[in-house]
Swiss-Prot record:
It is found in: Secreted. CDD domains: TFP_snake_toxin. Belongs to the three-finger toxin family. Ancestral subfamily. Residues 1-18 form the signal peptide. InterPro entries: Snake_3FTx (IPR003571), Snake_toxin-like_sf (IPR045860), Snake_toxin_con_site (IPR018354), Toxin_cobra-type (IPR054131). Disulfide bonds join C21-C42, C24-C29, C35-C60, C64-C75, C76-C81. Keywords: Disulfide bond, Secreted, Signal, Toxin. This is Probable weak neurotoxin 3FTx-Lio1. Expressed by the venom gland. It comes from Erythrolamprus poecilogyrus (Water snake). GO terms for cellular component: extracellular region. GO terms for molecular function: toxin activity. Its main location: secreted.
Amino acid sequence: MKAVILSLVAAFLYSGYTLNCRKCDETVCQLYWTCTEAETLCYILKNKTDTMGLQAIQGCAETCPVPEPDQEVKCCKTDYCNSYF
């Protein structure tokens, strides 16, 4: 009985969880962004030549973005894991 109750509590707590990521495009950055329930990944996409990460794009995604040949991408599944790499 105790296991059933713990399972129900865990399912209830997890059901409303949404991931939090850093969100940034070329001009505007928001350090704290709540993703939709469908967006289960954080990502950071940057040019390989941009060593400082000044033009990095960060955000939430349902699937990991496919980088262009001159880009790098990092996808992760924990809150605010999409820092500069």
